Amino acid sequence: MPGGKGKSIGGKAGSKDSAGKSQKSHSAKAGLQFPCGRVKRFLKNNTQNKMRVGAKAAVYVTAVLEYLTAEVLELAGNAAKDLKVKRITPRHLQLAIRGDEELDTLIRATIAFGGVLPRINRALLLKVEQKKKNKTEA
């Protein structure tokens, strides 16, 4: 029944060779955890003039995003471990990003509930040291 509904004859669906193989996603082929297909869709939707996006471009952007995420999470995990807690909070992310010079220049965003870095101005420290020195002399 070639023209009606039902099983089709031929094509890739009916071949015996493809029955044993399982499909691998672009992420699995590239050895990534982040979804390459979703990143490619976002790239296609957010480009102007509906430009074409190559598969390798999506894989590359996905790899960069995964690397940066792993880097930030590792540093935030170390910050949480130093404070002897088991949960990463926005404060730990803030400490991790602002503690690394390269990440600080890359991520200039304000992190909600991140707080501020502890820092005392040198001019204020000099005044405190001078007061202590004057008290010891007197």
Swiss-Prot record:
Entry PTM: Acetylated once deposited into chromatin.
InterPro entries xref list: Histone-fold, Histone_H2A, Histone_H2A/H2B/H3, Histone_H2A_C
Biased composition (Gly residues): 1-13
One GO MF term attached to the UniProt entry: protein heterodimerization activity
Region: Disordered, residue numbers: 1-32
Annotated localization: Nucleus; Chromosome
Residue numbers of N6-acetyllysine PTMs: K5, K12
Keyword DNA-binding carried by entry: yes
PANTHER family on file: HISTONE H2A
Similarity comment: family membership: Belongs to the histone H2A family.
Record-given protein name: Histone H2A.Z
Organism: Aspergillus niger (strain ATCC MYA-4892 / CBS 513.88 / FGSC A1513)
Lineage: Eukaryota, Fungi, Dikarya, Ascomycota, Pezizomycotina
